[in-house]
């Protein structure tokens, strides 16, 4: 009965057979032990392969991309992909790239200068980790880039990786903080360091060097701004196809205000993407207009900015007392 049921519902994928239990049943040739494929090769990815990959990713909505390559050409392609997807395709994203092992600080700064992008970060230190055989091996910086991209993907938008711990078993080499790290930060390199309490990100920045705007330099601030754009766009999307009249104009303003209000809620009540208070609102100056078949929305908002520096001033005073 079981055999008939399997055959009737298998749709050609299963062919069950009832075997006489009194007959000897031998194992199939490929089940007597583990058999591994042999021959063949992984091959080497060329530029055209990477372009095919980035073209395929135009159909996928992701927020972070980390190409597993040390090639500056691939890094440039990744940045171009992120710029296009963010500005044209309305699927904002960012990339983190890494150089090869033994990259000097000077070479890393030169590579960051060549990119100079607000949507691309660059790391130049590899890390030690155990391979599948239990041997401690050095992973190249572009693997570190993938690790950091995964970390960014696992936190709320607006959360910086600055001072966050990295789960590795050592860094390729040590940096002096602030002698080496400040120079790297000023050069647009996302630096990692070894501290007394573990391995940490010094400052999660992009390779942007044109100015010091937070939404351009800080990955977390730019990510927060991207999330604001996505949220407001999603809130307004149901209005596409509706009548261009005063009622729709009013509803658009309500939808924008509501979406921004949610984004301004601090954690754990909301995402905490926007920062503000009663005297300094998280968003303001909402302007909605209709011109022909175009509904235009403009507003000002304050994406949350990470604390990167904590100066401490100590005033020493002599002790005096009377009795």
What annotation goes with each model-predicted range?
Residues 284-323:
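C-terminal edge-of-domain segments
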Residues 248-277:
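Short, hydrophobic/π-rich interface segment
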Residues 267-294:
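Long, charged, glycine-rich C-terminal linkers/tails
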Residues 70, 261, 304:
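Residue-level marker of positions within ordered structural domains that often coincide
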Residues 1-243, 264, 271-277:
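A glycine- and small-residue-enriched flexible loop/hinge signal that marks low-structured segments
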């Amino acid at each position: 009965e079981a055999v008939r049921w399997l055959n009737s519902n298998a749709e050609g994928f299963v062919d069950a057979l009832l075997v006489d239990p009194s007959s000897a049943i031998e194992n199939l040739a490929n089940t007597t032990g583990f058999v591994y494929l042999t021959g063949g090769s992984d091959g080497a990815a060329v530029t055209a392969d990477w372009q095919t990959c980035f073209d395929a990713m135009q159909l996928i909505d992701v927020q972070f991309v980390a190409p597993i390559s040390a090639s500056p050409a691939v890094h440039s392609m990744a940045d171009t992909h992120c710029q296009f997807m963010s500005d044209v395709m309305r699927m904002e994203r960012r990339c983190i790239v890494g150089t090869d092992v033994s990259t000097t600080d000077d070479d890393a700064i030169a590579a960051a200068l060549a990119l100079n992008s607000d949507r691309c970060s660059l790391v130049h230190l590899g890390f030690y980790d155990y391979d599948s055989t239990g041997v401690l091996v050095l992973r190249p910086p572009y693997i570190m880039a993938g690790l950091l991209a995964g970390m960014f993907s696992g936190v709320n938008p607006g959360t910086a990786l600055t001072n966050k711990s990295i789960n590795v078993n050592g860094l390729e080499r040590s940096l002096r903080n602030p002698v080496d790290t400040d120079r790297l930060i000023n050069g647009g390199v996302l630096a990692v360091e070894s501290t007394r309490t573990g391995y940490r990100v010094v400052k999660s920045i992009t390779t942007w060097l044109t100015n010091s705007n937070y939404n351009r330099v800080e990955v977390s601030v730019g990510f927060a701004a991207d999330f604001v754009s996505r949220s407001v766009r999603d809130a307004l999307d149901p209005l596409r196809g509706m009548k261009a009249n005063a009622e729709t104009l009013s509803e658009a303003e309500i939808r924008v205000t509501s979406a921004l209000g949610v984004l301004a809620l601090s954690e754990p009540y909301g995402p905490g993407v926007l920062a503000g208070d009663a005297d300094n609102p998280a968003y303001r100056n909402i302007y909605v207009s209709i011109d022909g078949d175009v509904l235009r929305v403009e507003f000002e908002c304050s994406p949350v900015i990470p604390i990167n520096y904590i100066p401490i001033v100590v005033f020493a005073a002599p002790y005096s007392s009377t009795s």
